[in-house]
């Protein structure tokens, strides 16, 4: 076993691990970091994603603080661009000698890791400061795990990665799953020339969708957050009705009221394409696929040997139990701004750099679990507003200069106007949320 020494041991070279390490290396010119990942290259789940994947939110707010990604605006970087970007960032920091990356290695606990390529290569790390777990959010994609339903022998079932590799043209397609991956699969099939009638789409639950245009700074400052709708409503349904009327949130089908919210983001053009598919099956989750029938929770639909079934059911971001982010010699990276993992990780690193006391750091960096249901929308919206207000008050200059922060694109005057508006609404919104969902705010 080889012994090595470092200040920080970062487990995972995915988006959150890279954002954390980059911020710390940028702020502290003496810090040393060892980074370990099971993949051969940095980028985490991007290494396993399908070829046609792109960012769902603008590249301007993604990646790390020290390096721009894409040309700016609402540009959506491809998966290949993201992977090349992370390799560039890694190479930059490796050249300084302050970051050492150990690819194709598995962390086994107690500051030890081993090579996945050579069983005789094991390492023990003397960590001078802290061990950082950037894998806790547990991002999964369909290509790295089997489907969670029975599949009979001979059924043509593929992950989205294999759609571009089909050797025989199928008669039709069944896309299973309604999250971001399912939407991407449908959009890919349509873009490649499939007729909408060739596609059946199993949508277990409809979810509210975010309009990507709301990330444009001008529109964001005009619309603000959703606090005004929360304050003025008397029920959760009224909140969602108001957001629907203002088109701050969108629906896949205007005639179906969503029951889920998972931060899925689409453009108006993409939504129009998705609505071309009329063969939407709303019978719950798939239980089993046989050679001629698909069994769902609430019924069955026919299938056939020439049908390609596309598994898009991996829970990309699970709703994990909340843990304190700072605990002695450990840091567990989690979102502190809803659905903004890399921005959260970068700020957590900045808090680690600026503050010495764990209690103060945890007071600023309160974890927000990934939302799943409509009630989660209300909880995460109000808690994000609280966190953002506290963090902005503590370190306003960081927010103005961070490329991962939408505040960076506002300018000072717009930020002040928005901040004043939100500060007035926040106490009322928090009180309303606690009244509507007391069990979620019991602490």
Enumerate the predicted regions with their spans.
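Beta1/beta-strand and adjacent pyrophosphate-binding region of the FAD-binding site
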Residues: 2-16, 169-179
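Rossmann-like dinucleotide/flavin-binding elements
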Residues: 20-28, 162-209, 343-393
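Extreme N-terminal leader/targeting segments of oxidoreductases
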Residues: 1-8, 26-31, 125, 135-164, ...
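Feature captures the FAD/FMN-dependent oxidoreductase FAD-binding
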Residues: 68, 72-141, 263, 270-297
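Glycine-rich dinucleotide-binding loop and its adjacent helix/turn
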Residues: 72, 78-85, 133-193, 199, ...
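Glycine-rich active-site loop/strand segments that organize a redox cofactor
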Residues: 38-88, 160, 202-259
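C-terminal, flexible cofactor-proximal segment of oxidoreductases
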Residues: 349-443
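Short hydrophobic core segments
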Residues: 9-11, 124-140, 173-176, 304-315
């Amino acid at each position: 076993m080889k012994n090595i020494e470092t200040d920080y041991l970062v487990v995972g070279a995915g988006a959150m691990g890279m954002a954390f390490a980059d911020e710390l290396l940028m702020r502290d010119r003496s810090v040393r970091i060892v980074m370990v990942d099971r993949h051969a290259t940095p980028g985490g789940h991007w290494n396993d994603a399908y070829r046609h994947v792109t960012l769902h939110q603008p590249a301007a707010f993604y990646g790390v603080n020290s390096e721009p990604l894409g040309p700016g605006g609402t540009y959506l970087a491809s998966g290949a661009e993201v992977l090349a970007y992370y390799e560039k960032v890694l190479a930059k920091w490796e050249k300084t000698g302050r970051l050492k990356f150990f690819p194709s290695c598995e962390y086994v606990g107690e500051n030890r890791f081993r090579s996945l390529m050579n069983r005789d290569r094991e390492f023990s790390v003397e960590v001078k400061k802290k061990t950082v777990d950037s894998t806790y959010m547990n991002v999964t994609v369909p290509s790295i795990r089997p489907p969670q339903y029975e599949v009979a022998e001979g059924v043509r079932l593929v992950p989205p990665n294999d759609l571009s590799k089909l050797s025989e043209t199928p008669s039709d397609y069944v896309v299973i799953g309604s999250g971001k991956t399912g939407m991407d699969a449908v959009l890919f099939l349509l873009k490649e020339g499939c007729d909408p009638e060739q596609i059946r789409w199993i949508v277990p639950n409809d979810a509210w969708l975010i309009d990507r245009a709301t990330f444009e700074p001008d529109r964001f400052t005009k619309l603000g957050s959703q606090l005004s709708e929360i304050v003025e409503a008397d029920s959760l349904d009224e909140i969602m009705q108001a957001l629907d009327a203002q088109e701050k949130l969108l629906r896949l089908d205007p005639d179906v009221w969503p029951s889920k919210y998972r931060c899925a983001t689409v453009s108006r053009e993409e939504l129009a394409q998705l609505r071309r598919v009329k063969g939407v099956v709303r019978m719950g989750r798939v239980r089993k696929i046989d050679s001629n029938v698909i069994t769902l929770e609430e019924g069955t639909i026919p299938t056939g040997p020439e049908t390609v079934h596309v598994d898009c059911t991996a829970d990309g971001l699970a709703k994990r139990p909340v843990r304190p982010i700072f605990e002695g010699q450990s840091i567990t990276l989690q979102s502190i701004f809803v659905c903004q993992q890399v921005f959260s990780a970068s700020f957590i690193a900045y808090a680690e750099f600026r503050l010495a006391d764990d209690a103060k750091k945890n007071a600023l960096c309160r974890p927000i679990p990934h939302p799943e249901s409509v009630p989660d929308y209300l909880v995460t919206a109000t808690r994000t507003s609280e966190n953002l207000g506290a963090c902005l008050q503590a370190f306003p200059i960081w927010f103005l200069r961070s490329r991962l922060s939408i505040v960076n694109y506002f300018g000072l005057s717009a930020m002040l106007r928005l901040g004043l508006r939100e500060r007035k609404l926040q106490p009322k919104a928090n009180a309303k949320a606690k009244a509507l969902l007391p069990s979620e705010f019991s602490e």
